[in-house]
Structure formats: structure tokens, C-alpha cells
């Protein structure tokens, strides 16, 4: 049975696009039923429309009184969601949603967490720090989402080597390729029921 997926995105949604392409190639036993975005002008919405995926705009302008994201939770519950994927989503997920969908929300982060994680570390800002500190390695992390920024259990990480000649933009491009690779891998693991939990401990079934 196909897994029901909802994607959250705020920008270009390249990871969203990558997952869609893998589904089209029958490499994922899943279906994306909804795109949630806080940004009505983001490119991810254009891609959702092309692929006949419903889009839901959720932000403080539309719902100024929904401080706990209860309206959003009600919307999600209509889709019998198996998995929520954050793909460059720039807003914090509420406690009500992270608790209801515990161990069912994944995020991709452009660093080797816990390094360069937390509030304020996202996108090019991460790569600028890596470049400024002259790090010779970086990478990407797929983790489960909890109530805080970038602190949930880590599912997958992949490291890459960096040279002194690579600036923040070059690092970003290199890391994005890794993001696409390991996010697909993580979603595949979930769809194939290889992820299990025992008393809060993450177990991977071979």
C-alpha cells in the first residue's frame, strides 16, 4: 500500500521535486497528496500544480489567531498522513503537530548536525559559516522532527570533503546533491517499513 506523504516547503523545493521524480520512476511506493507552504509565491507551488498536487497556503496572514497551528493539524488529519517531509520549510512546526505525528516528520538539514544546527542556521547561512570557519568537511543530515530546531533523532548523515577553493555557493551546490541522495534514501527506508522504534530508540531493519 502506498504511503501518504505531505510535503512542507517555503522556497524552490528541490528536494520536493526530487522525491516526486523518484515516485514517477516507481522507486518509491508513495504518493504526495498535499504541499503545505507559508509562501504563496514559492517555486514549489508551481511544481505542485504541474503534478496535480493540492497546495495549501498556511501562514500568520491567513490565520493570525491560530497560534498552535490547530487549523493546520485539522487539515493534515484529512489525508491519513503516513509521513511529513520538510523540504526547505522556514517555519517552526508546532508542538501539537510534532506530538501528533511523532516519528512521522522528517527534515533535511544542510550540515552535519549537531554542527550548524538550530534557529538561524538554514540554507546559504549554513554554508557561509562553513566557509568562514574554513571547514574541510560538511554534509547533510536527515533527522526526525521534534519540538525544537534540528534536535530530533538523526536517521542518516553523509559527509563530503571540501577544498580551500570552494566558496559558500560551491559548498551549497555540493551539499544539495548529497541532500537529494540521502533524503530519497530516508524516504525509501520509511516507505519500505525499515524504520522502527523501541522505547524511544531508533532501530533500522535490514
Where in this protein do the model-derived segments appear?
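One-carbon transfer enzymes
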Residues: 1-206
Amino acid at each position: 500500500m502506498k504511503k501518504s506523504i505531505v510535503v512542507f516547503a517555503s522556497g524552490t523545493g528541490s528536494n520536493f521535486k526530487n522525491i516526486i521524480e523518484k515516485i514517477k520512476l516507481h522507486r518509491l511506493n508513495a504518493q504526495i497528496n498535499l504541499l503545505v507552504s507559508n509562501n504563496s509565491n514559492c517555486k514549489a507551488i508551481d511544481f505542485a500544480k504541474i503534478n496535480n498536487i493540492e497546495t495549501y497556503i498556511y501562514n500568520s496572514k491567513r490565520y493570525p489567531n491560530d497560534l498552535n497551528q490547530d487549523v493546520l493539524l485539522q487539515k493534515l488529519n484529512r489525508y491519513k498522513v503516513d509521513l511529513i517531509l520538510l523540504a526547505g520549510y522556514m517555519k517552526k512546526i508546532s508542538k501539537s503537530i510534532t506530538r501528533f505525528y511523532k516519528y512521522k516528520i522528517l527534515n533535511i538539514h544542510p550540515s552535519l548536525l549537531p554542527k550548524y544546527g538550530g534557529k538561524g542556521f538554514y540554507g546559504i547561512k549554513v554554508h557561509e559559516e562553513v566557509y568562514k570557519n574554513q571547514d574541510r568537511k560538511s554534509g547533510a543530515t536527515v533527522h526526525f522532527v521534534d519540538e525544537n530546531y534540528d534536535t530530533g533523532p538523526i536517521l542518516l548523515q553523509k559527509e563530503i570533503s571540501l577544498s580551500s577553493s570552494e566558496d559558500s555557493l560551491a559548498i551549497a551546490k555540493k551539499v544539495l546533491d548529497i541532500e537529494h541522495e540521502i533524503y530519497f534514501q530516508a524516504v525509501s527506508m520509511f516507505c519500505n517499513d525499515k524504520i522502527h522504534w523501541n522505547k524511544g530508540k531508533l532501530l533500522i531493519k535490514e
